[in-house]
Amino acid sequence: MEVFDVTIVGGGPAGLYSAFYSGLREMKTKIIDYQAELGGKVHIYPEKVIWDIGGLTPMSGENVIKQMVEQAMTFDPTVVLNEKVESIDKNEMGLFQLHTASGEIHYSKTIIVAVGGGILHPKRLNLEGAEKYEVTNLNYKITSLQRYKDKRVIISGGGNSAVDWANELVDIAKSVYLTYRKDVLSGHEAQVTKLMKSSAECYFNCSITKLISENNQSIEHVELTNHESGDILALPIDEVIINHGYDRDIDLLDNSPSLGVEIKDGYFVAGSPNSESSVPGIYAAGDILHHEGKLHLIAGAFQDAANAVNQAKKYIDPMANNFAMVSSHNEMFKERNEKLKASAAASV
């Protein structure tokens, strides 16, 4: 039975920084993530530019993920991907047991819950046979804007993301259509105004009711039905983007009643500014954590993560320092710093 000092559930910004900081505190660390790759929700908007991380110049979500993952791997944590933690309990030895969907049990002295808004599943288009087009031109997220260059694109949805993507694609795609089941878009006002002034065509009170394909491989026409008038319109398209929101899998703590973790608003971990939960040894970081003054930014997730790790360290060893030594004066980085200096000198 292999036991870890800390197991981090979730591989987004909060989980990744938790992994780095726990390594800095010389803790044996494991990350378990449901997704096939680390990075969390940032994967939903890889080409979006992120401005609000302190000390970083504006960069794409994709590059932010790359840097966060690289930092998280500094101290070689164990990483388990494509694995869902379904419940947590505690054994007679006082160790936390994380039960996963595959049947594995992971053992840990402490746990940091960093699952953000939960496991996100995009809401699928509710049309029979639609799933077969997901390998060709039915999309639930945008990973590359250039994929849509000079194409006819229809976006279904009226929220912030749908409106935002429509605005992004107007200058790239050949034509952009947006269809929404209501008569008023619910995105941010400035973005809605921008869209309405653009060349995009909007179809209100309409839904996609049929996908038409002669080759049975890719969608060639989309049938829209107006719920008010009953009118039906067939649009020739090259790409379909569905943005109907996400279903959240938030069952982890609900499935762990024996722990008694206090929950806020049916989902969030009711915690402290130090990232403590109501249960000693269990901590939370990122969007899953709730307390007065909580900052819902990536920058805030980093502070949550450091606080959670420090509390976990003290839980394991009450005599440990409250904080890690800062990296600029930490001997753990001496060899790494020398390599960086040598590399910089060689490149001159």
Curated annotation (Swiss-Prot):
Quaternary structure and partners: Homodimer.
Cofactor-binding details, from the entry: Binds 1 FAD per subunit.
Catalyses which reaction(s): 2 reduced [2Fe-2S]-[ferredoxin] + NADP(+) + H(+) = 2 oxidized [2Fe-2S]-[ferredoxin] + NADPH
Superkingdom of origin organism: Bacteria
Family, similarity comment: Belongs to the ferredoxin--NADP reductase type 2 family.
Disulfide feature: none
Cofactor(s) this protein requires: FAD
Lineage: Bacteria, Bacillati, Bacillota, Bacilli, Bacillales
Keywords: FAD, Flavoprotein, NADP, Oxidoreductase
Molecular-function annotations in GO: ferredoxin-NADP+ reductase activity; flavin adenine dinucleotide binding; NADP binding
Protein's UniProt name: Ferredoxin--NADP reductase 1
